[in-house]
């Protein structure tokens, strides 16, 4: 469910050594399955463990996950990264905003999941996003760009070289992608 790297375990072990005996960590998602989902880590003293919690045992600690957050923390990774600028704890949870769909789910659900879990987080760094409008009977995914992607001069490259390649690799049953957006260049446009 959750991978906690060795460096993150060391970091947590140091922090936990200064807490009440038996205190572990809790990993959770606030507003799971929504666009405003946020992940967090907190201390979990022994008296805060609920009967419905899942305990994940690691070499140096245990992480507790509440029943509601668990499906949204599938494939999550916690790491402690040190570089020239300092140290930072990172928590990546690709399923926090949308629950992972099964491989045999309808094509439209699998495409929507790929957009929300992999493509939109990349576009978000430019203030952009893409939405699935439909999948045609001919097998084309019809997309609409928003935010910084709307009116961006690089949108064709993003569509053909990025999104389409990724989607065709993941879904061979698709024939391609089409952009439905009426692009309006403005201050909101990234390029």
Swiss-Prot record:
**One GO term (biological process):** iron-sulfur cluster assembly
Q: Does the keyword Iron-sulfur apply?
A: yes
- Can you quote the record's cofactor note? Binds 1 [4Fe-4S] cluster per subunit. The cluster is presumably bound at the interface of two monomers.
What cofactor does this one take?
Answer: [4Fe-4S] cluster
Which InterPro entries does the record associate with it?
Answer: Fe/S_biogenesis_protein_NfuA, FeS_biogenesis, FSCA_dom_sf, HesB-like_dom_sf, NIF_FeS_clus_asmbl_NifU_C
Q: Which domain of life is it from?
A: Bacteria
SUPFAM superfamilies, A to Z: Fe-S cluster assembly (FSCA) domain-like, HesB-like domain
Q: Which residues bind [4Fe-4S] cluster?
A: 149, 152
| Pfam family, any one | NifU
What are the UniProt keywords, alphabetically? 4Fe-4S, Iron, Iron-sulfur, Metal-binding
| Family to which this protein belongs | Belongs to the NfuA family.
Subunit structure, as described in the record: Homodimer.
Q: Which PANTHER family does the record match to this protein?
A: FE_S BIOGENESIS PROTEIN NFUA, IRON-SULFUR CLUSTER SCAFFOLD PROTEIN NFU-RELATED
Protein name (database record):
Fe/S biogenesis protein NfuA
| Encoding gene, per UniProt annotation | nfuA
């Amino acid at each position: 469910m959750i991978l906690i790297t060795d460096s993150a375990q060391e970091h947590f072990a140091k922090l936990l050594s200064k807490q009440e005996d038996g205190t572990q960590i809790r990993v959770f998602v606030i507003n799971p399955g929504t666009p405003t989902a946020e992940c967090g880590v907190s201390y979990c003293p022994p008296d805060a463990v609920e009967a419905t919690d899942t305990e994940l045992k690691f070499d140096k600690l245990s992480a507790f996950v509440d029943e509601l957050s668990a499906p949204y923390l599938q494939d999550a990774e916690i790491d402690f990264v040190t570089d020239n600028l300092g140290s930072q704890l990172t928590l990546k949870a690709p399923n926090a905003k949308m629950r992972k769909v099964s491989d045999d789910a309808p094509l439209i659900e699998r495409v929507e999941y790929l957009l929300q879990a992999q493509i939109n987080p990349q576009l978000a760094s430019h203030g952009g996003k893409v939405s699935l409008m439909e999948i045609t009977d001919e097998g084309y995914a019809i997309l609409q760009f928003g935010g910084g992607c709307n009116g961006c001069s690089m949108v064709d490259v993003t569509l053909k070289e990025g999104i389409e390649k990724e989607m065709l690799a993941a879904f061979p049953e698709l024939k391609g992608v089409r952009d439905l957006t009426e692009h309006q260049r403005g201050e909101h446009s990234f390029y």
